Amino acid sequence: MRYLTAGESHGPRLTAIIEGIPAGLPLTAEDINEDLRRRQGGYGRGGRMKIESDQVVFTSGVRHGKTTGAPITMDVINKDHQKWLDIMSAEDIEDRLKSKRKITHPRPGHADLVGGIKYRFDDLRNSLERSSARETTMRVAVGAVAKRLLAELDMEIANHVVVFGGKEIDVPENLTVAEIKQRAAQSEVSIVNQEREQEIKDYIDQIKRDGDTIGGVVETVVGGVPVGLGSYVQWDRKLDARLAQAVVSINAFKGVEFGLGFEAGYRKGSQVMDEILWSKEDGYTRRTNNLGGFEGGMTNGQPIVVRGVMKPIPTLYKPLMSVDIETHEPYKATVERSDPTALPAAGMVMEAVVATVLAQEILEKFSSDNLEELKEAVAKHRDYTKNY
């Protein structure tokens, strides 16, 4: 399974093409749109979310509510594009029109300046348009397809925010994936501790009044994962490594950890390793899950627990200093629409990319042309694992 996305932030549409989804997977536009709505939600979101109400359109690969095995093409129309027809025109236009909304003041922390240098742009909007987090719309759409596949294999996935701008959220112990999903969905800030809800919302309001932004940490948890996804035989086949790449590829994500993560560096080995248990009912399990569901780059049957750290959104309403690329004079950075935080939305993107990598790994291990064969192969593997 592989995919590509295309489109600009203020272009006419966003597109994704997925190849490798088995035939026979039940799939509707609403399956995708539900996740797109969640990506646009969350406390503190700003103007763009009021303009766009994302709806996906299938143009190939789905017929009568089921996948056909052909490449799946999905489009999302950018409604805001009508205000940008000249600025984002694919055809050559007059110089006076080209200068409208031209960007020469790069924003610190964005791709603006480095993209301009790399691709030799005199208008940094070319960098901004593709590097914008608007692109993650289609990664969420791709992830929604992947999640439908995982659900057919009795795997479940959820995300929630565990740190908001330095404020750690207390997470009750032993929550199931379903409980995490339910609690986070009921929260405007995607946390599982309702007692902290108003405190976090007040904090976001204060950050907005200050013209500043905050980052934080998002956790994704996956249950029902088969044993043995990934491999130790080559460095690039380790599944946790593939997931790490996917997570830090998300806009503004700067770090990733599994299970205890960096805390493991402060503990003794006897306090980190997960003891192995066996029972006739459950087969092999672990007493703890400090390693986040991985051993040797492979899934061990425990829930996958992965966290990603998101830096504060770099577009500030009190902009930092920058330099004009034409005059080299100091200027305040360009201000585009921005939010004080996008952590709840980022959680949806992280959930999507994790689901996508897991779907790719499932289809690599249990290669199947249709859903029925895939389900049979996974069920057979689970029986084998339990009786090993």
Swiss-Prot record:
Pfam families membership: Chorismate_synt
Record-listed FMN binding positions: 130-132, 251-252, 296, 311-315, 337
Superkingdom assignment: Bacteria
InterPro entries the record matches: Chorismate_synth, Chorismate_synth_AroC_sf, Chorismate_synthase_CS
EC number: 4.2.3.5
SUPFAM superfamilies, sorted: Chorismate synthase, AroC (SSF103263)
Keywords: Amino-acid biosynthesis, Aromatic amino acid biosynthesis, FAD, Flavoprotein, FMN, Lyase, NADP
CC per GO annotation: cytosol
Listed cofactors: FMNH2
Biochemical pathway: Metabolic intermediate biosynthesis; chorismate biosynthesis; chorismate from D-erythrose 4-phosphate and phosphoenolpyruvate: step 7/7
The record's free-text note on cofactor binding: Reduced FMN (FMNH(2)).
Recorded catalytic activity of this chain's protein: 5-O-(1-carboxyvinyl)-3-phosphoshikimate = chorismate + phosphate
Subunit text: Homotetramer.
Family: Belongs to the chorismate synthase family.
Protein name: Chorismate synthase
Species in which this protein is naturally found: Streptococcus pneumoniae (strain Hungary19A-6)
